[in-house]
Curated annotation (Swiss-Prot):
Cited PANTHER family: KELCH PROTEIN (PTHR24412), KELCH-LIKE PROTEIN 3 (PTHR24412:SF179)
Cellular compartments annotated: Cytoplasm, Cytoskeleton; Cytoplasm, Cytosol
Modified residues (Phosphothreonine): T295, T375
Record-given protein name: Kelch-like protein 3
Sequence similarity: Belongs to the KLHL3 family.
Assembly notes: Homodimer. Component of the BCR(KLHL3) E3 ubiquitin ligase complex, at least composed of CUL3 and KLHL3 and RBX1. Interacts with CLDN8.
Keyword Cell inner membrane: no
Keyword Phosphoprotein attributed: yes
Annotated PROSITE patterns: BTB (PS50097)
One GO cellular component term noted in the UniProt record for this chain: cytoskeleton
Any one of the GO BP annotations: protein K48-linked ubiquitination
Gene assigned in the entry: KLHL3
């Protein structure tokens, strides 16, 4: 503040052999430069001692040459060189709009500038022109923080045009790491042929299956089919068809009209079919770009724990960082929600149905991890709490549950592409407090409570989306309602749960290949209504209750050692009936 005294720092220097007369003190006033620039800016605002006028469009800005030259190499070269501008009183700056130039000259005097979504694309090139490299870097940092599947390709193109090398690399890596979501957006569909080829040929492309790459090619061609059809073979050259399952090749790729009508594409399909006929040792001898597995850069993951009872329905959402063993609070749910189904799909976390403390609901909220915000989408057809939720073939399934008066056998599915819910075949048994999981293209509904027999269930049903039918598979060894169900290495785990008043710590695992259940090691604690997720080959069971209190602890199972281990750090809140999902950690 004006008139405020500033503490000076000083240093006394004494040379060896000198007497006291040769002592000297250097005094540093850290506020001096700031005060000086503040006064210069006040002089500028009063148009005092100004010796140059900078003009852009219809905006005229009075300034001091020495200040501009001190902060901008562009102005320094202009004012100290042999150009006519070195003596001119009025200088026009082209290729910069007046408002942006005014902001940048304000920055020269104040060291303050606001970068926003609205101004960053004009601010960065203007800062580059004036060689205000700190502002340019701030713009790059801002764009990097805004990377999202819907804009990363646009930011990549912008970075390329303006030679922002680091931002270009970051945006490209982001596009590769989030390809399944990126391919759904308008930016991807608007790419040029060479840009699509460059992206889908990358070894670093992060896809759970080569199916996504094939689907992306078909979508891009169909977007402007008339002009793009001729590029089909060039694109399919970069799809690693031999790495696709044989069933998918026969049922989907071979049936695609764009493949049927192109001889080169049919050759790629034949190559893939022949690859599947070879013994494994001979497959390894085939070396071409289409048989080489992709090697994506693994993104660190975080675990999201959504809502729950503590002891009433809550809005709180916690995020666990596996690398740092730390829990953080993130954006709360728009309203209280427990007993919901929670899944990760297409780059977002979905919280489906549940109980808000007074009513069973059919509403759905979606979390965007990049923006750290929740939004609402289309509601389900029925109210459901204690439902099961899972993702299969890009559809979100809401299975069973309780509508406030009765247990439900009905099942509905949601397409994020159309934002619509529709019913599929109901289960054979009403199931509330049901656990669900997806293994090898089938959806399983495990245990629960049917409300009619007043018994917890040991039965398990399997849904086949190809036939839209539910069938019973092998029963569990024990009745389990509120079991935590998860999938690890192609097997279905049922953890804890309860049978009447008895809360279990036992765990059993289902092998679809043999249609059998077997016991594995017990958990450290009895748990029902816990959240479950699989990360990096481990199965995590989160919270729940033990029959008397809600639990804040988390434990994980290692199938190699057949042991459960408690996480060293608990959640901030004990919660049961919370949903769990795993997402990529934001860059």
């Amino acid at each position: 503040m004006e008139g405020e005294s500033v503490k000076l720092s000083s240093q006394t220097l004494i040379q060896a052999g000198d007497d006291e007369k040769n002592q000297r003190t250097i005094t540093v006033n850290p506020a001096h430069m700031g005060k000086a620039f503040k006064v210069m800016n006040e002089l500028r605002s009063k148009q005092l001692l100004c010796d140059v006028m900078i003009v852009a469009e219809d905006v005229e800005i009075e300034a001091h040459r020495v200040v501009l030259a001190a902060c901008s190499p562009y102005f320094c070269a202009m004012f100290t060189g042999d150009m006519s501008e070195s003596k001119a009183k009025k200088i026009e700056i082209k290729d910069v709009d007046g408002q942006t130039l005014s902001k940048l000259i304000d920055y020269v005097y104040t060291a303050e500038i606001e970068v926003t979504e609205e101004n960053v694309q004009v601010l960065l090139p203007a800062a580059s022109l004036l060689q205000l490299m700190d502002v340019r870097q701030n713009c790059c940092d801002f764009l990097q923080s805004q990377l999202h599947p819907t804009n990363c390709l646009g930011i990549r193109a912008f970075a390329d045009v303006h030679t922002c090398t680091d931002l270009l690399q970051q945006a490209n890596a982001y596009a590769e790491q989030h390809f399944p979501e990126v391919m759904l957006g308008e930016e991807f569909l608007s790419l040029s042929l060479d840009q699509v080829c460059s992206l889908i040929s990358s070894d670093k492309l992060t896809v759970s299956s080569e199916e996504k790459v094939f689907e992306a090619v078909i979508s891009w061609i169909n977007y402007e089919k008339g002009t793009r059809l001729e590029h089909m073979a060039k694109l399919m050259e970069h799809v690693r068809l031999p790495l696709l399952p044989r069933d998918y090749l026969v049922q989907t790729v071979e049936e695609e009209a764009l493949i049927k009508n192109n001889n080169t594409c049919k050759d790629f399909l034949i190559e893939a079919m022949k690859y599947h006929l070879l013994p494994l040792d001979q497959r390894l001898l085939i070396k071409n770009p289409r048989t080489k597995p992709r090697t994506p850069v693994s993104l660190p993951k975080v675990m999201i724990v959504v809502g729950g009872q503590a002891p009433k329905a809550i809005r709180s959402v916690e995020c666990y960082d596996f690398e740092e063993d730390r829990w953080d609070q993130i954006a709360e749910l728009p309203s209280r929600r427990c007993r919901a189904g929670v899944v990760f799909m297409a780059g977002h976390v979905y919280a489906v149905g549940g109980f808000n403390g007074s009513l069973r609901v059919r509403t759905v909220d979606v979390y965007d991890g990049v923006k750290d915000q929740w939004t609402s989408i289309a509601s389900m057809q029925e109210r459901r709490s204690t439902l099961g939720a899972a993702v299969l073939n890009d559809l979100l399934y809401a299975v069973g549950g309780f509508d406030g008066s009765t247990g439900l056998a009905s099942v509905e599915a949601y397409s994020y592409k159309t934002n619509e819910w529709f019913f599929v075949a109901p289960m054979n048994t009403r199931r509330s407090s049901v656990g669900v999981g997806v293994v090898e293209g089938k959806l399983y509904a495990v245990g629960g409570y049917d409300g009619a027999s007043r018994q917890c269930l040991s039965t398990v049903e399997q849904y086949n989306p190809a036939t839209n039918e539910w069938i019973y598979v092998a029963d569990m060894s024990t009745r389990r309602s509120g079991a935590g169900v998860g999938v690890l290495s192609g097997q279905l785990y049922a953890t804890g749960g309860h049978d009447g008043p008895l809360v279990r710590k036992s765990v059993e695992v289902y092998d679809p290949g043999t249609n059998t259940w077997k016991q594995v090691a017990d958990m450290n604690m009895c748990r029902r209504n816990a959240g479950v997720c699989a990360v990096n080959g481990l199965l995590y069971v989160v919270g729940g209750d033990d029959g008397s209190c809600n639990l804040a602890s988390v434990e994980y199972y290692n199938p190699v050692t057949d042991k459960w281990t408690l996480l060293p750090t608990n959640m901030s809140t004990g919660r049961s009936y919370a949903g769990v999902a795993v997402i990529h950690k934001s860059l």
